[in-house]
Amino acid sequence: MLQPKRTRFRKQFKGRIHGVSKGGTDLNFGAYGLKAVEPERITARQIEAARRAITRYMKRSGRVWIRIFPDLPVTSKPTEVRMGKGKGSVDYWAARVAPGRIMFELDGIPEDVAREALRLGAAKLPIKTRFIQRIAE
């Protein structure tokens, strides 16, 4: 699963996702993409589940790019532990995704295959998404 090799600090604040995505809103690598429509934190497990669903449907043809990376440590305290005594330990890693952000890109496959692969991948994610494609020039 995806996670940073090392970080400057072990724990971070929750933070909020305001407005639309500042960068990563255009297709840079592939011809087809999956774009987020609403803000959410997406975990490394969800990214991996979506990637597996996409690559499994593509059957080793084409190429997949993951455009988001889980760099936010999410902490939690053990069950049945009283409040206080400091912040919990890091439980998992997540990526903040703002509306308009491209999460996955595909290339080297027909449009109908890409559309279905990204639909299956989107089913593994907790947000509404939209299929986009590069405009033929």
Curated annotation (Swiss-Prot):
Source organism, top-level taxon: Bacteria
GO molecular function: rRNA binding; structural constituent of ribosome; tRNA binding
Entry-linked InterPro entries: Ribosomal_uL16, Ribosomal_uL16_bact-type, Ribosomal_uL16_CS, Ribosomal_uL16_dom, Ribosomal_uL16_sf
SUPFAM superfamilies: Ribosomal protein L16p/L10e
GO CC terms of this entry: cytosolic large ribosomal subunit
Residue ranges that the Swiss-Prot or TrEMBL entry lists as coiled coil: none
Statement: the UniProt record of this protein carries the keyword RNA-binding: yes
Pfam families for this protein: Ribosomal_L16
Keywords associated with the record: Ribonucleoprotein, Ribosomal protein, RNA-binding, rRNA-binding, tRNA-binding
GO biological process, one term: translation
PROSITE patterns: RIBOSOMAL_L16_1 (PS00586), RIBOSOMAL_L16_2 (PS00701)
Membership in a protein family: Belongs to the universal ribosomal protein uL16 family.
Described function: Binds 23S rRNA and is also seen to make contacts with the A and possibly P site tRNAs.
Self-association state and partner proteins as the record states: Part of the 50S ribosomal subunit.
UniProt-recorded name of the protein: Large ribosomal subunit protein uL16
